[in-house]
């Protein structure tokens, strides 16, 4: 990796949740939010680029779904250093199974596992080489 920060994309239709995530994540050293999307179309456009390392993906979006986003990403783009975190209020087993089958690395319930997103991203950010060496 040539960059010195873990680059995050937030895919969430709720402005309140986006703000809460942004506030929580910006406290993590070596992490920056490089993009945000509210719809499936916006998310796919961002995630087809190469300017991200991890994405937080809601299942229910303003237009479209997180499952649609996962389906639209080519398997070839799912390289090992990219992490997809599904973060949803719809944490049903069938959604988890489908999300993981489509390439999600993690699946968390917004109402009970908000802290887990931060834990995962903190660990990933700690692995990013710093600019000083």
Model regions and ranges:
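Non-catalytic signal-transmission and effector/linker regions of two-component phosphorelay proteins
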Residues: 1-7, 115-133
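Two-component/phosphorelay signaling modules centered on CheY-like receiver
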Residues: 15-35
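Acidic, metal-coordinating helix/loop segments flanking the phosphotransfer/catalytic sites
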Residues: 36-54
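Short amphipathic alpha-helix used as the core "switch/output" element in two-component signaling
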Residues: 67-80
